[in-house]
């Protein structure tokens, strides 16, 4: 059983000096890096393995896939429902693949051959992806990797590039759609590449409830960096596209909203699930750093100002982000913030 307690602004005021120290540490750690490098380095805090599970010592069954978030714990079973029953010799496109850990966990237990093409802008992550599948899934082929962002991939396909196979049996996009300049364009692209009966497995943190999105929007608005509100629109466009209202949606609402947004009817919404996921850190410095796992370090380069802003927001409004400290469970003695995610399975007809 997990027990946690919310932290108040009054309690955090007594630790103002700790926040200043963490701000200085982060400035030293992240200074001089590109936006993508900052994104990758801070994201690594999420993917720290559970040492008990890593060494097979979680005999009580409380081991977790990542210490930094329960998103993978909740997502992997949903991905497995589709990936484990794909036809032999099927093809999968893994967009924003990272190092492949999530997809690898979802494929545990599959013995039939499968081909996966991962796409990610970070070359190191793609090399790790290939090494991981070569070691853990020898029956699954990674015939090639694509070092690219989403927009670049779509532009290449429009230009007539033969970068991709003719079709895929599944397209995975786990927390990568934020980096597309057009959510409707991305979804249409994914549906175009699917074989009839294939599924788009889309995962994203709700624009209306996520810590990272809230921090990015607040920062841009405070310093007047998005006068036309383009970022706010992009942060909420996915919520609007799937019919998310007041934090909930249904398959029928989602389907109706997607029909309108995409102006096509060759799909059906197979499943839509909101998962009450969280992100976890060992100290308050981790919690500040988590604001950089999204677009914040890419859309503005003033790192010192960004760090100070995030730190101040956390201290003044911890209840807005449901900042907590855990006293029991697999992540005891860790801090956490609310970062709900939504899983959407769309089948091509």
Protein language model features and the residues they cover:
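A short acidic, Gly/Pro-enriched loop at the edge of an enzyme's catalytic core
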Residues: 156-171
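A short SAM/SAH-binding and catalytic strip from SAM-dependent methyltransferases
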Residues: 168-184
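Conserved class I S-adenosyl-L-methionine
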Residues: 199-236
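Conserved Class I S-adenosyl-L-methionine
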Residues: 253, 266-349
């Amino acid at each position: 059983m997990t027990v946690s307690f919310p932290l108040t602004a009054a309690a955090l005021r007594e630790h103002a000096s700790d926040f200043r120290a963490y701000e200085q540490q982060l400035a030293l750690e992240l200074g001089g890096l590109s936006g993508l490098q900052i994104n990758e380095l801070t994201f690594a805090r999420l993917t720290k393995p559970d040492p008990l599970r890593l060494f097979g010592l979680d005999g009580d069954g409380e081991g977790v896939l990542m210490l930094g978030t329960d998103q993978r714990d909740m997502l992997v079973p949903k991905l497995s429902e589709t990936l484990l029953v794909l036809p032999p010799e099927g093809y999968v496109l893994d967009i924003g693949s990272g190092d492949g850990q999530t997809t690898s966990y979802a494929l545990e237990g599959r013995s039939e051959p499968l081909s996966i093409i991962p796409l990610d802008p970070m070359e190191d992550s793609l090399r790790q992806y290939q090494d991981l599948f070569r070691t853990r899934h020898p029956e699954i082929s990674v015939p090639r990797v694509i070092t690219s962002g989403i927009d670049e991939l779509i532009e290449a396909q429009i230009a007539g590039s033969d970068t991709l196979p003719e079709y895929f049996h599944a397209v995975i996009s786990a927390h990568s759609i934020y980096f597309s300049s057009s959510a409707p364009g991305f979804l249409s692209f994914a549906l175009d590449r699917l074989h009839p009966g294939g599924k788009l497995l889309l995962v994203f943190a709700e624009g209306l409830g996520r810590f990272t999105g809230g921090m990015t929007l607040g920062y841009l608005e405070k310093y007047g960096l998005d006068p036309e509100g383009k970022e706010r629109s992009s942060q909420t466009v996915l919520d609007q596209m799937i019919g998310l209202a007041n934090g909930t949606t249904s398959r029928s609402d989602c389907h109706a909203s997607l029909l309108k947004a995409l102006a096509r009817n060759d799909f059906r919404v197979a499943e839509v699930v909101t998962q009450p996921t969280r992100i976890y850190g060992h100290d308050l410095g981790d919690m500040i750093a988590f604001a950089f796992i999204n677009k914040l370090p890419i859309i503005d380069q003033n790192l010192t100002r960004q760090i100070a802003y995030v730190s101040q927001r956390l201290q003044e409004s911890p209840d807005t982000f449901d900042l907590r400290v855990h006293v029991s469970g697999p992540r005891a003695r860790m801090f956490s913030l609310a970062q709900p995610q939504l899983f959407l399975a769309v089948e091509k007809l």
